[in-house]
Amino acid sequence: MSGDAFAEFERAGWERAASHYEDCWTDTGLFVEALLDAAAVRAGSRLLDVACGPGFVSEAAAARGAVPVGVDLATAMVERARARCPDLTFVVGDALRLPFPDASFDAVTMNFGILHVSQPERALAEARRVLVPDGRLAFTTWMAQGNATDEISDAALAEHAIAVEGPEGPSYYVFAEPDECRHALAGCGFDLGSLRMDTVTALWRVPSADSLFQAQLHAGVRTAAVLRAQPPERLEAIRSAIADGVRRYADGDAFALPIAARLISAGPSGAGGDGREHR
């Protein structure tokens, strides 16, 4: 499937999922403050929140006194963000063709959006284009290890799902591997001397053993497409297996799922720095 087809698949999926996202995927919000710190967002910072979804990052940035603008490919996501944060600015736009002039933002963030674009390197290059010379990009991507959510879901799908042909898109863990990340950032105009790659872990608390399955089914895109293609008996087997996996993480009256992300940040080339990568 071409990049344009994958982009349309993602756009349509998020249009459908937008009304469920903020209730289902509270896990992404656990990384917002660290993301803003990595992007050096403070009072007065002009922030571009790429793949803004319902506006979690923009909302937190505004609480710091920053001036955020959120952009998302899905109109329904932008409408939801505007409803949640009526005093902030959100626009429909493509991370690969940002509708903003060169050097117009002090910081650019992308909270788990990089895995949802058809050309991740192009998204990095666009972020570089709209950054001021001393600005900073920060983005998150999932780690391949340390994520109970993926381990549980992947095991259930491997055992019970009928194979479904889907679009070819980036890995869920795109740029989490350090060498891949360095190569991409350098090629897109970022200074490796300013690069930081941190691993951030959290516990995602969900109220029921069924929460993860419901999130995957109603508020996801790629996995949701696989689930919707299953016959009823297969879908129920997957649901049951995921619920059993979640129950292993019981914590009082809820469930605490370990999750891990790579937090990556860098400034543009030519902005100064000591030439050494920071960790």
Named regions from a protein language model:
Residues M1-S45, F56-A60, M77-R80, R84, ...:
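Conserved class I S-adenosyl-L-methionine
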Residues G3, E10, D27-G29, P54-F56, ...:
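Conserved Class I S-adenosyl-L-methionine
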Residues R46-L98, A107, R122:
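Class I SAM-dependent methyltransferase SAM/SAH-binding core
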Residues D106-P120, M143:
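A short SAM/SAH-binding and catalytic strip from SAM-dependent methyltransferases
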Residues E121-R122, R128, P133-S208, T223, ...:
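Conserved catalytic/acceptor-binding region of the Class I
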